[in-house]
Amino acid sequence: MMRKLAVTLALASTALATPALARDNAWYVGVEGGAMIVEDINFDIGAATSAGTVDHNYGWDVGGVIGYDLGGFRIEADVSYRRATVDGYRSTVTTPARTAAGALVNFPAGNYDYAGGSSSALSFMVNGLLDFGEDDGIQGFIGGGVGVSRVKADYGLNDNGSFLDDSDTVFAWQVLAGLRQPISDNIDVTLKYRFFNADNVKLVDVTGRNFDGRFRSHSILGGITFNFGEPPAPPPPPPPVE
């Protein structure tokens, strides 16, 4: 009787120790999207420090990932695009801009609450993520990544034409944290926070003046991930020979 009880407990403990949804040594692909806040962009204009500031409305952030789960640590590549429209522009120097008719006019320093246009960033990143928690339950993760980003600015004053329409490709980095939850043997849903930073963005306005600044954003993203290619689970151990 005691031997049978010991065998039963051994088999039960083996089953409990083996995750129902093993993600170790598996590939995954995913898509994600959500809302974004862009920090005010302060531009050095020519020799004038912090001479122009761009305010933004709420924006959006979408992307896709492909990665590999090493067991407790994941490495992945992601491509993402984020964009927000301009809510206002203020400058301590004059702003040359083209009118709707195409004429070039110098607008005085001041606040332009109805400035238009958008800021955007397309990025290609490589990330490393640390996982904590069980594969078959809610699992947390934290990590970061580095890569390159193409930052684009397209700004206009009021109903007039553009005063800045340029882009630059720069080094970028990001910090990531979130949760993931399996909903089937191969599919997870995710909730992620992303802090994204692209420094040393150098742009040129319609008259050739340099605009130097940075792009920073905060995003909350929902996503779905498909896991595939995991090795088959090992067979259960044979029962002890009585």
Feature annotation, model-predicted:
Residues 41-49, 87-94, 152-161, 201-209:
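Outer-membrane beta-barrel translocator domains and adjoining extracellular loop/strand segments
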Residues 20-67, 153, 223-227:
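Short glycine/proline- and aromatic-enriched beta-strand/turn motifs that initiate or cap beta-hairpins
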